[in-house]
Amino acid sequence: LDYSDTEEYYEEVANKIDEFIEEYKYQKERILGVSIATQGIISPDGSGVMYGTIMNNVKMRLSDFSSKLPYPCRLVHDSKAAAYLELWNHSELDSAVVFLLNRNLGGAIITNRKVHEGSFMHSGVIEHICINSDGPLCYCGNRGCLETYCSANALEQAAGIPAKEFFPLLREKKSPQIIQIWKDYLNHLAFAMKNLNLVIDAPIILSGYLAPYFTEEDIKYLAEHLHTAAPFILDKTQILVGTNGQYTPAIGAALHYVEKFIQSI
């Protein structure tokens, strides 16, 4: 369902939620709430999107959904939602840097087992770190953002094929071009990991759509590349890989109400 700022769109979303509830025969009175994970920076009060260039959803408001659903509702930035899931999956972590390797790149900072929001809600927006001022044009209007090198879209554009076709070819190790494209991707990723680790001395979590495609060999390559480029060693055990793929933000968003319920018991 493609986003559009129309009553028809919000009605359709509400209808699909109702259909889902009916299909799986959930008891409505036991539904804790509905979390909507979306691309775009959410306002501090959670009432709407205040920056949404990718989806052009800056007019999206929480009330667009809550007025059509009989449940508590909340909006959450997809990258922050992904971080909630990684926190849930890694109870041993106090702090971390999350790379959300989705169609568009995202990120989040975890400190003291909380997702850091920042004064204006854009803490952890690592996709707009500039790694080459003469690089490709980013959707934000600047050049050389990490988005243009390490998003799934950037990888697919470089390869000219979808990720689901790229990785089987890569693992065959028969195409020097495919191997080089992946090596370039990992080099840019390692560059960003190195710099962020100097700011946040904590494990790095590779999460989202591309994460399940990473192998032990890839993690070893990243760790070795980091060792040669940084004054401090980031052991490969400090590079964690998420397992929930493209559904990471959706699951993480839902956990808000699950955790709230557990704490109320």
What are these model-predicted stretches?
Residues 263-265:
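Nucleotide/phosphate-binding catalytic cleft detector across ATP-hydrolyzing
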Residues 2-9, 63, 68-176:
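Glycine/GP-enriched mid-protein hinge/lid loop-to-helix segment characteristic of carbohydrate kinases
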Residues 2-22, 30-95, 216-228:
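Glycine-rich phosphate-binding loop and adjoining helix at the ATP-binding site
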Residues 40-44, 81-83, 106-107, 116, ...:
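Short, active-site-adjacent cap segments at secondary-structure transitions
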Residues 226-239:
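Charged, glycine-enriched surface loops/patches
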